[in-house]
């Protein structure tokens, strides 16, 4: 089943593959929600020598606190003895291993090891991940850019073009 640690391992394999390509230039990491957590922790593990810059969109560092609380996206469970899986929206299921690994995930501790340029974009109207989780990334990454978008939701549904523009401008500036 999917866990954050095995998604980080997958991200490292993708990085290794990209770096093996003869035409590969500098590598950036970007991710939305849980993908932002994975991008931040992978960048922390690989370091600024390997990852030129990072962009996080509504990074879901809340997932650890959710697991500790026993409430992930509205699905409730005993955090000390999670079931085999919990039912999420639609037909989505979250497995026991995900909850158990999320419970003690060193999200900010690992991400903090990254010292390169970073950009965090988060909305004040995010009902899934409070924007304070994005602010905390800004606090652990001195010199990072923080864009707090007023009333923007978790999917940036009304601000998509603005998010794309901020992301592209940042990547163009930092991947030269």
Protein language model regions, located:
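Gly/Ala-rich beta-loop-alpha elbow adjacent to hydrolase catalytic centers
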Residues: 31-35, 39
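Conserved active-site and cofactor/substrate-binding residues in soluble primary-metabolism enzymes
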Residues: 6-9, 38, 162
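Short, hydrophobic alpha-helical segments
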Residues: 18-19, 171-176
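Alpha/beta-hydrolase fold nucleophile elbow
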Residues: 22-32
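Catalytic nucleophile-loop/oxyanion-hole region of alpha/beta-hydrolase
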Residues: 1-24
């Amino acid at each position: 089943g999917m866990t954050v640690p095995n998604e980080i391992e997958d991200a490292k394999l993708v990085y290794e593959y990209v770096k093996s390509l003869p035409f590969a230039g500098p590598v950036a990491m970007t991710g939305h929600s849980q993908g932002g957590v994975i991008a931040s922790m992978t960048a922390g593990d690989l370091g600024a020598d390997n990852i030129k810059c990072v962009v996080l969109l509504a990074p879901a560092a809340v997932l650890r606190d959710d697991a500790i609380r026993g409430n992930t996206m509205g699905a409730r469970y005993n955090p000390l003895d999670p079931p085999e899986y919990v039912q999420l929206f639609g037909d989505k299921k979250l497995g026991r291993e995900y909850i158990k690994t999320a419970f003690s995930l060193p999200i900010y501790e690992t991400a903090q090891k990254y010292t390169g340029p970073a950009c965090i974009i988060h909305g004040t109207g995010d009902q899934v991940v409070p924007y304070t989780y994005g602010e905390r990334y800004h606090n652990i990454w001195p010199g990072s850019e923080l864009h707090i978008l007023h009333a923007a939701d978790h999917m940036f549904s009304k601000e998509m073009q603005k998010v794309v523009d901020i992301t592209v401008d940042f990547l163009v500036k930092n991947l030269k």
